[in-house]
Amino acid sequence: DIANDPMSAGRQMGGHFTTHSLDKNFNWKNLTEQYNSSSDISPTGAQMPRLLGLAQASKVYRELKSKNSNKFSKNGNEVAWGTIGNASTSEGVFFETINAAGVLQVPMVISIWDDEYGISVHAKHQTTKENISEILKGFQRDSKSNGYEMLKVHGWDYVELINSYQ
Protein backbone atom coordinates (compact mmCIF):
# COMPACT_ATOMS: atom_id res chain seq x y z
CA ASP A 1 0.00 0.00 0.00
CA ILE A 2 1.78 3.13 -1.24
CA ALA A 3 -0.28 5.40 1.03
CA ASN A 4 0.92 3.69 4.21
CA ASP A 5 4.45 2.91 3.03
CA PRO A 6 5.46 5.58 0.51
CA MET A 7 9.03 4.28 0.22
CA SER A 8 8.25 0.85 -1.18
CA ALA A 9 4.55 0.05 -0.85
CA GLY A 10 5.43 -2.67 1.64
CA ARG A 11 8.11 -4.36 -0.47
CA GLN A 12 11.10 -3.43 1.71
CA MET A 13 12.16 -3.67 5.32
CA GLY A 14 11.50 -0.61 7.44
CA GLY A 15 14.23 2.03 7.31
CA HIS A 16 15.30 1.20 3.76
CA PHE A 17 14.42 4.55 2.29
CA THR A 18 14.34 5.33 -1.41
CA THR A 19 13.14 8.05 -3.73
CA HIS A 20 10.56 7.30 -6.37
CA SER A 21 11.82 7.20 -9.96
CA LEU A 22 8.36 6.72 -11.48
CA ASP A 23 5.32 8.96 -11.24
CA LYS A 24 1.83 7.72 -10.29
CA ASN A 25 1.26 6.71 -13.94
CA PHE A 26 4.49 4.67 -13.95
CA ASN A 27 6.34 7.08 -16.25
CA TRP A 28 9.92 8.10 -15.55
CA LYS A 29 10.24 11.25 -13.47
CA ASN A 30 12.91 13.80 -14.34
CA LEU A 31 15.50 12.48 -11.88
CA THR A 32 17.74 15.51 -12.42
CA GLU A 33 15.19 17.68 -10.61
CA GLN A 34 15.36 15.77 -7.33
CA TYR A 35 17.85 14.23 -4.94
CA ASN A 36 17.87 10.48 -5.49
CA SER A 37 18.43 7.77 -2.93
CA SER A 38 18.79 4.14 -3.92
CA SER A 39 17.17 1.86 -1.38
CA ASP A 40 19.50 0.26 1.11
CA ILE A 41 19.65 -3.50 1.39
CA SER A 42 20.29 -5.72 4.39
CA PRO A 43 23.24 -7.99 3.47
CA THR A 44 26.45 -6.59 4.90
CA GLY A 45 28.46 -4.69 2.28
CA ALA A 46 25.99 -5.41 -0.51
CA GLN A 47 25.48 -1.72 -1.24
CA MET A 48 28.99 -1.47 -2.70
CA PRO A 49 28.47 -3.08 -6.15
CA ARG A 50 25.31 -1.01 -6.62
CA LEU A 51 27.26 2.14 -5.68
CA LEU A 52 29.82 1.26 -8.33
CA GLY A 53 27.03 0.76 -10.87
CA LEU A 54 25.52 4.16 -10.12
CA ALA A 55 28.93 5.82 -10.48
CA GLN A 56 29.59 3.94 -13.73
CA ALA A 57 26.19 5.06 -15.05
CA SER A 58 27.17 8.67 -14.44
CA LYS A 59 30.40 8.16 -16.35
CA VAL A 60 28.54 6.47 -19.23
CA TYR A 61 26.09 9.38 -19.43
CA ARG A 62 29.05 11.71 -20.09
CA GLU A 63 29.61 9.91 -23.39
CA LEU A 64 25.99 9.06 -24.20
CA LYS A 65 24.32 11.09 -26.92
CA SER A 66 20.77 9.84 -26.33
CA LYS A 67 17.99 12.38 -26.65
CA ASN A 68 16.12 10.80 -23.74
CA SER A 69 18.96 10.82 -21.22
CA ASN A 70 18.22 14.33 -19.94
CA LYS A 71 15.69 12.90 -17.46
CA PHE A 72 18.35 10.72 -15.87
CA SER A 73 21.56 12.72 -15.93
CA LYS A 74 22.98 16.21 -16.29
CA ASN A 75 25.66 15.20 -18.78
CA GLY A 76 27.11 12.64 -16.38
CA ASN A 77 28.05 15.20 -13.75
CA GLU A 78 26.50 13.25 -10.89
CA VAL A 79 28.57 11.74 -8.11
CA ALA A 80 27.46 8.50 -6.48
CA TRP A 81 27.85 8.71 -2.71
CA GLY A 82 27.61 5.76 -0.35
CA THR A 83 28.41 4.79 3.19
CA ILE A 84 29.67 1.64 4.84
CA GLY A 85 30.64 0.66 8.37
CA ASN A 86 34.16 -0.48 9.11
CA ALA A 87 32.99 -4.04 9.84
CA SER A 88 31.46 -4.37 6.37
CA THR A 89 34.78 -3.41 4.80
CA SER A 90 35.88 -6.96 5.65
CA GLU A 91 33.50 -8.26 3.00
CA GLY A 92 34.93 -9.21 -0.39
CA VAL A 93 32.46 -7.04 -2.30
CA PHE A 94 33.94 -3.97 -0.61
CA PHE A 95 37.45 -4.62 -1.94
CA GLU A 96 36.15 -5.65 -5.36
CA THR A 97 34.25 -2.37 -5.60
CA ILE A 98 37.19 -0.28 -4.39
CA ASN A 99 39.49 -1.85 -6.96
CA ALA A 100 37.01 -1.65 -9.84
CA ALA A 101 36.16 1.98 -9.10
CA GLY A 102 39.85 2.85 -9.14
CA VAL A 103 40.39 1.07 -12.44
CA LEU A 104 37.29 2.61 -14.02
CA GLN A 105 37.91 6.05 -12.47
CA VAL A 106 34.23 6.66 -11.78
CA PRO A 107 32.73 9.59 -9.83
CA MET A 108 32.20 7.94 -6.47
CA VAL A 109 32.50 9.02 -2.84
CA ILE A 110 32.56 6.49 -0.02
CA SER A 111 32.30 7.41 3.64
CA ILE A 112 33.51 4.69 5.98
CA TRP A 113 32.15 4.99 9.49
CA ASP A 114 34.90 3.50 11.66
CA ASP A 115 34.10 3.17 15.35
CA GLU A 116 36.63 0.34 15.78
CA TYR A 117 33.81 -2.14 16.33
CA GLY A 118 31.87 -4.31 13.94
CA ILE A 119 28.48 -5.43 15.15
CA SER A 120 29.96 -7.11 18.24
CA VAL A 121 33.73 -7.50 17.86
CA HIS A 122 36.65 -5.13 17.98
CA ALA A 123 38.50 -4.26 14.77
CA LYS A 124 41.54 -6.29 15.85
CA HIS A 125 39.47 -9.44 15.28
CA GLN A 126 38.48 -8.62 11.71
CA THR A 127 40.64 -5.87 10.18
CA THR A 128 44.33 -6.09 9.33
CA LYS A 129 46.22 -3.35 11.18
CA GLU A 130 42.93 -2.67 13.01
CA ASN A 131 42.43 0.30 10.71
CA ILE A 132 40.79 0.28 7.28
CA SER A 133 42.44 3.61 6.37
CA GLU A 134 45.86 2.01 6.75
CA ILE A 135 44.89 -0.86 4.46
CA LEU A 136 43.52 1.47 1.79
CA LYS A 137 46.62 3.69 1.58
CA GLY A 138 47.79 1.75 -1.47
CA PHE A 139 44.80 3.12 -3.39
CA GLN A 140 45.86 6.75 -2.77
CA ARG A 141 46.21 8.69 -6.01
CA ASP A 142 49.68 10.02 -6.82
CA SER A 143 51.41 11.77 -9.72
CA LYS A 144 52.31 8.46 -11.41
CA SER A 145 49.04 6.54 -11.28
CA ASN A 146 45.29 6.64 -10.86
CA GLY A 147 43.72 6.04 -7.52
CA TYR A 148 41.59 7.91 -5.04
CA GLU A 149 41.81 11.03 -3.02
CA MET A 150 41.47 9.81 0.53
CA LEU A 151 40.65 11.99 3.49
CA LYS A 152 40.52 10.90 7.11
CA VAL A 153 38.51 13.02 9.50
CA HIS A 154 36.84 12.69 12.87
CA GLY A 155 33.23 11.84 12.13
CA TRP A 156 32.11 13.51 15.35
CA ASP A 157 33.60 16.86 14.19
CA TYR A 158 30.78 18.13 11.99
CA VAL A 159 32.71 21.11 10.59
CA GLU A 160 35.69 18.90 9.71
CA LEU A 161 33.33 16.40 8.09
CA ILE A 162 31.59 19.08 5.99
CA ASN A 163 34.94 20.56 4.92
CA SER A 164 36.16 17.16 3.75
CA TYR A 165 33.17 16.83 1.41
CA GLN A 166 33.77 20.25 -0.09
Question: What are the roles of these predicted feature ranges?
Answer:
Residues 1-104, 111, 122-140, 145:
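Cofactor-binding active-site loop characterized by glycine-rich and histidine/acidic residues
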Residues 82-84, 149-154:
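Short catalytic-loop micro-motif centered on adjacent basic/acidic residues
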Residues 107-111, 149-152:
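Short hydrophobic alpha-helical runs that function as membrane-insertion/retention elements
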Residues 116-119:
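Short gly/pro/ser/thr-enriched loop/turn and capping motifs at secondary-structure boundaries
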Residues 157-166:
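Structural signature of the thiamine diphosphate
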